[in-house]
Design a protein with these regions (language model features):
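Terminal targeting segments of Actinobacterial cell-envelope proteins
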Residues: 1-15
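Conserved active-site-adjacent core of cysteine acyl-enzyme catalytic domains
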Residues: 2, 6, 23-71, 164-320
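Short, hydrophobic alpha-helical membrane anchors of single-pass surface/secreted proteins
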Residues: 15-21
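Ser/Thr-rich, Proline-interspersed low-complexity disordered segments
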Residues: 60-115
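Active-site nucleophile-adjacent alpha helix/oxyanion-hole segment immediately C-terminal to the catalytic cysteine
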Residues: 114-170
Length: 320
C-alpha cells in the first residue's frame, strides 16, 4: 500500500517538469515578442511580411489597372549666373522717317547674388511626426505626415490605420508588383485627402532629384516624399541646404535635406538607427540612404536604376 508521503514525492518531478515547460514557453514567447519588436535578425520584418501575405491572400490578386504614370525628368541645363537682358536700342535721330519719341531704356534689375540657402518649411517637426505602426507602413505614415503639415490630417494611430485601410482603392500592379503601397498609390491617397497634384518623378542623378525636389518645395510650400532604401522606404523632405537658391541657379548643389523618417525611433538591422524628426541629413547620409530604385519582386521599366520622388506641383490651401 502506497503511503501519502510516497505519493507526494512522486508528484514533485511531474510538477517540476510542468514548471520547466511553462518557463520555456513564457521565455520563448517573450523572446519572440522582443525579436519582432526590435527587429532582431530581421524578425520584425519577417513577421510583418507574413501578416502582409495573409492580407494579400484575403484581398485577392493585385488589380492590373491604370494608375498615375512615372514622369521621367530631363536634367535642367546648368547655366551660369542669371544675366540681365540687353537694353533695347533707342531710335537713331539720323534715321529717315518721321521723328518719334525714343523708347526709354529699361531700368536694369540687380543680378541675383549667389549665396547659400537654408530652407525648412516645418517650424515644429515633432508636431507633425507619425511613427509607422508596422514595419511595412512607411508609406501611409509618410502620407499622414504630409497631410498633417498641410493641415489636412492629425497624427493619430487611428488616422494611419484609416489611410492604410483604403489601400485597395489605390493599389495597382504596375505601381507595386506585390500590391499595397507604391508611389502612385501614395499620390492617389494624398489627392483623396485634399492634397492633389503630387507627381511620381524619376531622375538619372541624386543631385538632379534633390534640386528638383527643392525647387518644388519652395514653389508650393509642400513637403516632398523621397523613395529611399532602393524604393523600400519613404522619407518626408521638409527642407534643404544648398550653396545657392536652386530656383534661380540651376547648378546649385544641394548639401542635404531636413527629413521626417517614419521609422524613428526603430533600429533596422540593415540600415541602422533612424533619426529624430527634423534631422538634417547631410550629403553622406543622402548617399547612404537615397539610392536608385531596385526592387527584388520584379522589374519596373520606368523606375529601375533611377532616383524616385513624389513631388508637389500645386499649392494646397490650408484646411479651415
Amino acid at each position: 500500500m502506497t503511503s501519502a508521503a510516497g505519493r507526494r514525492r512522486s508528484r514533485r518531478p511531474f510538477r517540476r517538469i510542468l514548471l520547466a515547460v511553462a518557463f520555456v514557453f513564457v521565455v520563448g514567447i517573450l523572446g519572440a515578442t522582443f525579436a519582432v519588436t526590435t527587429d532582431t535578425l530581421g524578425a520584425g520584418r519577417l513577421f510583418d511580411r507574413a501578416v502582409a501575405k495573409v492580407e494579400r491572400f484575403l484581398a485577392g490578386p493585385v488589380p492590373d489597372r491604370p494608375t498615375i504614370a512615372t514622369v521621367r525628368v530631363s536634367p535642367r541645363p546648368a547655366t551660369p549666373s542669371p544675366t540681365l537682358p540687353a537694353p533695347e536700342p533707342t531710335s537713331d535721330p539720323a534715321a529717315s522717317g518721321p521723328p518719334h519719341t525714343p523708347t526709354p531704356t529699361p531700368t536694369p534689375k540687380p543680378t541675383p547674388k549667389r549665396v547659400p540657402v537654408d530652407v525648412e518649411i516645418a517650424a515644429n517637426p515633432e508636431a507633425i511626426f507619425a511613427h509607422q505602426l508596422t514595419k511595412t507602413w512607411c508609406a501611409p505614415a509618410s502620407v499622414q505626415m504630409t497631410l498633417a503639415y498641410l493641415g489636412l490630417a492629425d497624427i493619430s494611430d487611428e488616422f494611419q490605420r484609416k489611410v492604410h485601410g483604403r489601400i485597395r482603392e489605390w493599389e495597382s500592379k504596375s505601381d507595386s508588383l506585390n500590391g499595397n503601397w507604391g508611389p502612385a498609390a501614395m499620390a492617389l491617397a494624398l489627392d483623396a485627402y485634399g492634397a492633389p497634384g503630387y507627381e511620381v518623378r524619376a531622375y538619372e542623378g541624386r543631385q538632379e532629384a534633390l534640386r528638383d525636389a527643392a525647387v518644388a518645395l519652395e514653389a508650393t510650400g509642400s513637403p516632398v516624399i523621397l523613395l529611399t532604401w532602393r524604393g523600400a522606404h519613404t522619407w518626408v523632405m521638409t527642407g534643404f541646404r544648398a550653396n545657392a537658391d536652386p530656383a534661380i541657379f540651376p547648378d546649385a548643389r544641394i548639401s542635404g535635406a531636413y527629413i521626417l523618417d517614419p521609422w524613428y525611433p526603430s533600429v533596422s538591422s540593415l540600415w541602422g538607427p533612424s533619426d529624430p524628426p527634423g534631422t538634417f541629413q547631410d550629403d553622406a547620409e543622402m548617399v547612404r540612404n537615397y539610392l536608385r530604385w531596385n526592387r527584388p519582386e520584379g522589374t519596373y521599366p520606368d523606375r529601375d536604376g533611377l532616383f524616385i520622388a513624389l513631388v508637389p506641383t500645386v499649392v494646397v490651401k490650408p484646411a479651415d
